[in-house]
């Protein structure tokens, strides 16, 4: 799984989050 796919999945499951916040969350896990 690539980073952009992970961002899309997290964003889809958390529609209340801004895209940049989702990216920050993903970056924190990586």
From Swiss-Prot:
Keywords: DNA recombination, DNA-binding, Transcription, Transcription regulation, Translation regulation. The keyword Metal-binding does not apply. Coiled coil: none annotated. One of its GO terms (biological process) is DNA recombination. This protein is one of the two subunits of integration host factor, a specific DNA-binding protein that functions in genetic recombination as well as in transcriptional and translational control. Involved in hydrogenase gene expression. Heterodimer of an alpha and a beta chain. Belongs to the bacterial histone-like protein family. This is Integration host factor subunit beta.
């Amino acid at each position: 799984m690539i980073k952009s796919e992970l961002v899309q999945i997290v964003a889809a499951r958390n529609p209340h989050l801004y895209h940049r916040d989702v990216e920050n969350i993903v970056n924190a896990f990586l």
